[in-house]
Amino acid sequence: MTNQLIYTGKAKDIYSTKDENVIRTVYKDQATMLNGARKETIDGKGALNNQISSLIFEKLNMAGVVTHYIEQISKNEQLNKKVDIIPLEVVLRNVTAGSFSKRFGVEEGHVLETPIVEFYYKNDNLNDPFINDEHVKFLGIVNDEEIAYLKGETRHINELLKDWFAQIGLNLIDFKLEFGFDKDGKIILADEFSPDNCRLWDADGNHMDKDVFRRDLGSLTDVYQVVLEKLIAL
């Protein structure tokens, strides 16, 4: 059925379209943290996230990365290929920060010699636990070959993103990706890429991402607007 709400999330709602293989994603003016324990409505945030993610996914598509992104259709809406989401958050860390620093008792800001890829099991009831390859296989999420693909593709995407952000004076600290199976059973990049799911620091170490909200550092939309303007100029 066309225009039927098929999923509602913390930051996005997803609707069906007249094409069974295409969905309409609507970005919300909502910021959350602690797995949704803290929520706040922030006017304009949805449009900024949508525009930033659209720009990034357009560049990834042009660079040969296969993604779910089709086109932006309004300031806070885009069309995407329908996928079966793999219940994994794939996190890549270039620099120590956030939960990584807390977990291992290391200071933020240490550049990792080799970027680290981590898996988190997407399960709200379990608070998205950190898991390893063996857990992924035990849970039947993906197989060895698919695990290797997820890691390799994430590292490839990281190299592209690091270069693009460096060109606009931003350091890509870490980020979270989600992947899904398309109608042909191929794994493709899904979800979004915005300051909601990555850490960006400027040359002075200022946070240009959702940590502004998490740590009460100022106006989230002001920071996101700066990131958007930098990406438009890229």
From Swiss-Prot:
Q: Which InterPro entries did the record assign? A: SAICAR_synt/ADE2_N, SAICAR_synt_PurC, SAICAR_synth, SAICAR_synthetase, SAICAR_synthetase_CS
Q: Which terms does the record give in the GO molecular function aspect?
A: ATP binding; phosphoribosylaminoimidazolesuccinocarboxamide synthase activity
Q: Which CDD domains match?
A: SAICAR_synt_PurC
Q: Which UniProt keywords apply?
A: ATP-binding, Ligase, Nucleotide-binding, Purine biosynthesis
Q: Which Pfam families does the UniProt entry name for this protein? A: SAICAR_synt
Highest taxon above the source species: Bacteria
Q: Which reaction does it catalyse?
A: 5-amino-1-(5-phospho-D-ribosyl)imidazole-4-carboxylate + L-aspartate + ATP = (2S)-2-[5-amino-1-(5-phospho-beta-D-ribosyl)imidazole-4-carboxamido]succinate + ADP + phosphate + 2 H(+)
The pathway that the record names for this protein is:
Purine metabolism; IMP biosynthesis via de novo pathway; 5-amino-1-(5-phospho-D-ribosyl)imidazole-4-carboxamide from 5-amino-1-(5-phospho-D-ribosyl)imidazole-4-carboxylate: step 1/2
Under Enzyme Commission nomenclature, its number is: 6.3.2.6
Question: Nucleotide-binding: is it a keyword of this entry?
Answer: yes
Asked if the record carries the keyword Chloroplast, the reply is no
Q: Which GO terms describe its biological process?
A: 'de novo' IMP biosynthetic process; cobalamin biosynthetic process
Q: Which HAMAP family match?
A: SAICAR_synth
Spell out the family assignment given in the record's similarity comment.
Answer: Belongs to the SAICAR synthetase family.
What is this protein called in UniProt? Phosphoribosylaminoimidazole-succinocarboxamide synthase
